[in-house]
Curated annotation (Swiss-Prot):
GO terms for biological process: lipid A biosynthetic process; lipopolysaccharide core region biosynthetic process. InterPro entries: LpxK, P-loop_NTPase. This is Tetraacyldisaccharide 4'-kinase. It catalyses: a lipid A disaccharide + ATP = a lipid IVA + ADP + H(+). One of its GO terms (molecular function) is ATP binding. Pathway: Glycolipid biosynthesis; lipid IV(A) biosynthesis; lipid IV(A) from (3R)-3-hydroxytetradecanoyl-[acyl-carrier-protein] and UDP-N-acetyl-alpha-D-glucosamine: step 6/6. It comes from Shewanella baltica (strain OS195).
Amino acid sequence: MQALVNKIWYQGHPLRWLLLPLSWLFAVITYVRRALFRLGIKSQTAMPVPVIVVGNITVGGSGKTPTVIYLIELLRQHGFTPGVISRGYGVDIQGVRTVNLGASAVEVGDEPAMIVARTQVPMVVGAKRVDAANALIAEFGVDVIICDDGLQHYALGRDIELVVIDGQRGLGNGLLLPAGPLREGAWRLDAVDFIVNNGGPAAKGQFEMQLAPTEVKPVKCDLTSGEYSFDKSQPLVAMAGIGNPARFFESLRAQGYQLALCQGFDDHQPYDKTQLRDLAQDLPLLMTEKDAVKCRDFAQENWWYLAVNAKLSPQFDEQLLARLREVAAAKQGNFHGIR
């Protein structure tokens, strides 16, 4: 099914025209919903601290999670105490839930588990972002909230909107769901504060981001750096359960890894030991960091993951920090802006 969807959205498959009437209906629904918030008919809750929403206008992965991790580290370097909220995709959460270090993807979602494992940032997940944000402030006293996804969750007031675009796939065929991959029309990009292009080239007004690979690490957590080594010249099986698996495989080939087999999975797909053991056979299995957090409880010693770090320009850092300081000063002056 996912292969057919990708053909419709990104390769010009003629089935998109049959779905177009549904896209028109979706356009009306999304426009009316946003208008209700802008007109004040539906309420939007402002937070007492700045809120940065990191999202996209397309379905599927675009590089939001590496961007969130980048922002966490950037803000810490400049004296802020950030916290993160998220929906916790695929997890049935009643109320809100704090993401503790070592929490499983089954409990909190794969991306929250990965973010906390990497950064140890204060994080709360919940279906209602407003409740998650209030819990984050009450429990941890953060001075900036980063909302992982949630661009279309207008009940949460936001001060800075940052959209991440997949530089390879762009906006696909430019159509709204279900005929295309768009959650909102391309016009929405004109209303956000920052557009980050993952993989570039960045258009005017956008900031290019590159994902730089780090060292290969074992999925098993009980191995330390002195107890393992990885030979990238050996044949291996690569797997990726992310929005654009091809990007991961292309990156591995460019780095000189010898890929005997590449297996893409749906984003957020759960795994089990037998499934992946049968996939790898006796070869090393190399996966993304987001996949690794779902496999640690049953990982084999020859299962590995490759993490990436987002790289953005100093100009991006300067502009985002300047905007954030403006917002923080206004909040301290008892100004609560709702956009």
